[in-house]
Amino acid sequence: MKAFEVNFDGLVGPTHNYSGLSYGNVASETNIRDVSNPKEAAKQGLRKMKALHDMGFKQGVLLPQERPDIATLRRLGFTGSDREVLLQAAHQAPVFLGAVASASCMWTANAATVSPSADTTDGRVHFTAANLNAKFHRSIEHPTTTRILQGIFNNDQYFAHHKALPPTSQFGDEGAANHTRFCKNYEDKGVELFVYGRVAFDENAPRPMKYPARQTLEACQAVARLHGLADSSVVYAQQNPAVIDQGVFHNDVIAVGNRNVLFYHEQAFLNTSQMLTELEGKLQGCLLKAVKVSDSEVSVADAVSSYLFNSQLLSLNDDDMMLVVPHECRDNPNVKAYLDDLVTRGGPIKRVEVFDLKQSMKNGGGPACLRLRVALTEAELAAVHPHVMMSDGLFDTLNAWVDKHYRDRISQQDLADPQLLTECRTALDELTQLLQLGSLYPFQLA
């Protein structure tokens, strides 16, 4: 049965702000305390979703989460009414408030790791929500992420859902941002590449010195076991610790793959030749096409500032692919020159599409961060909750919803405004009704 890649983009939440919470993420640290525009952020994401839908790609939407997360503040000892909890946190621990108000769940590449049915032993699509244990503000996401995924992929015949791995650094899991699947066609059995930054239980193994490695080998292996992946369908590769120390906090900041194409920077991996040999040996029915970008063409610094590799690599047809990049790639002369040359070389990447995602980019999230890829057969796609699939009508509905509920400016001081909490809950309550998903959020389940 024919299968498709479906991209589920995160809808930016009403509290989108720049709290600078992500050490190791250069953009996040650079833009700390800037004033954000949640309305424009959401609309930028929606415009990308709609444009790709209009090009014929299958596109879905994943919901934002309840923020500020009052339940987490209560777990940290703040008491009283929701308003009192919010004001106590703002006064006593503003950094906590910034964390629980983060809209970071927009980057759905970190929501989960997904293995399609062609790869798994039970023939179902498997989802494991990422524990995101490396960052407090992201570690609180996975319970709601799991509920959202279960609500959208709600058919046990086709879909299997796993809880996040144990919330310890030894099993730090960042989801699909460190995972790429290679195959001939989406319905064919593929090879899943898991990329890790360190080996948790081997202190002598290579690891970065400046910035933390968020993903462990042990987490990758655990997810592969949960999904029932055969050893012949899995490759584990270590990300180069030196590029992590240059701000490459996820592999999708330095490499991207689709079907039988890997687009990567020459410094992306620790043992590149060994990894490519293993991938080529395990990939069935087609040849791996590795498109290497040398340091002389694009430096790691330029790759990080432009997010060249945090792009979407999409199939136009059986042979040709399109790269979806942020506008920052056109603003960087070296990257622009490289892309202009790339599409004329005769390789698999024939086209480049540029999108303005500046609101997300200032927090360190490009096109690839904003989407979770799910390969689905026709029958599986038919079993997906239909009201989250992009259409002309859904685009108009969500734009009107954003116009109704979102602010066009949020500063750090605004996060302590009890009215913002009310606005967020009102918006999300209406959203679950619009998308016909029932109760998903803590305030709805209380």
From Swiss-Prot:
What EC numbers are recorded for this enzyme?
3.5.3.23
Q: Which GO terms describe its molecular function?
A: N-succinylarginine dihydrolase activity
The active site consists of 174, 250, 369 (nucleophile)
Catalyzed reactions per annotation: N(2)-succinyl-L-arginine + 2 H2O + 2 H(+) = N(2)-succinyl-L-ornithine + 2 NH4(+) + CO2
Which pathway does the database say it acts in? Amino-acid degradation; L-arginine degradation via AST pathway; L-glutamate and succinate from L-arginine: step 2/5
Read off the Gene3D superfamilies from this record: Succinylarginine dihydrolase
Residues holding substrate: 19-28, 110, 137-138, 214, 252, 363
Keyword annotations: Arginine metabolism, Hydrolase
Q: Which GO terms describe its biological process?
A: arginine catabolic process to glutamate; arginine catabolic process to succinate
An example of a Pfam family matching this protein is: AstB
* InterPro entries noted in UniProt: AstB_sf, SuccinylArg_d-Hdrlase_AstB
UniProt xrefs under PANTHER family: N-SUCCINYLARGININE DIHYDROLASE
Could you describe the subunit structure of this protein?
Answer: Homodimer.
Q: What does this protein do?
A: Catalyzes the hydrolysis of N(2)-succinylarginine into N(2)-succinylornithine, ammonia and CO(2).
Q: Which family does it belong to?
A: Belongs to the succinylarginine dihydrolase family.
For this entry, the protein name equals: N-succinylarginine dihydrolase
